């Protein structure tokens, strides 16, 4: 881990996400990947609280927005299918959206996380100088993050039409953010969903291909279901 100062860690903790909170689509994960030395120091030195995903990640020498990344590809496919884009599942289509529109400040998507500090993996813990353990970090940070995300939703200039919270392990925390929503299961218990007067909320597995099941057929079923409720 880089020798981050306390003010730098506080800056990392204040990070909100990528894109437009007033956009049509929200994607809410648990925590962002990428807690290596390079990315942490760049984030601490150069990131604002809200970033454009393409311009901010261009600061990482190791990153390439033209490379198809499973999580972002599935986000792009969901947006494409709901928006009626032709060939929405094809890699060329999702990569083009990923490169040019996903997580852009003045566009239609907002990518945020329950926890603000990035990690390379679930077992990785590069913040031992500031938090005793991941459990201690969660207990200290989650209440403020919970309040922040609730406020961000309530104060968004126009409410998102669709909020996708991904990572089944974290459904209880996603449900706490949107505690006024009555969620029910659908698609053979593979999702939870609910809605208010302006937004459809969907809780899913993690956005990946293998056991999480986000192939073309499931994304088609998911989007058909969501569109039937809108």
Which positions does each model-derived feature cover?
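A polyanion-binding, active-site-adjacent surface
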Residues: 1-158, 207
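C-terminal capping/extension of enzyme domains
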Residues: 1-6, 131-150, 169-230
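Secondary-structure boundary/capping signal
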Residues: 86-87, 162, 182
């Amino acid at each position: 881990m880089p020798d981050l100062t306390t003010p730098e860690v506080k800056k990392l903790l204040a990070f909100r996400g990528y894109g437009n909170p007033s956009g049509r689509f929200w994607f809410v994960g648990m925590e962002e990947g990428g807690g290596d030395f390079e990315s942490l120091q760049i984030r601490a030195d150069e990131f604002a609280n809200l970033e454009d995903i393409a311009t901010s990640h261009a600061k990482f020498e190791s990153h390439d927005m033209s490379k198809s990344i499973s999580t972002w590809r599935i986000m792009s496919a969901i947006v494409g299918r709901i928006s009626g884009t032709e060939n929405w599942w094809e890699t060329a289509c999702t990569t083009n959206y990923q490169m040019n529109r996903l997580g852009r400040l003045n566009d239609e998507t907002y990518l945020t996380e329950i926890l603000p500090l990035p990690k390379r993996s679930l077992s990785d813990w590069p913040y031992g100088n500031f938090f005793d353990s991941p459990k201690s970090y969660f207990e200290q940070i989650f209440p403020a993050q919970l309040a922040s995300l609730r406020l961000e939703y309530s104060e968004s200039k126009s409410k998102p039409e669709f909020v996708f919270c991904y990572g089944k392990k974290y459904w209880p925390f996603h449900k706490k953010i949107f505690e006024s929503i009555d969620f029910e299961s659908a698609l053979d218990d593979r999702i939870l969903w609910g809605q208010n007067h302006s937004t459809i909320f969907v809780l899913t597995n993690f956005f990946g291909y293998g056991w999480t099941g986000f192939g073309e057929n499931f994304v088609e079923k998911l989007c058909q279901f969501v569109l039937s409720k809108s």
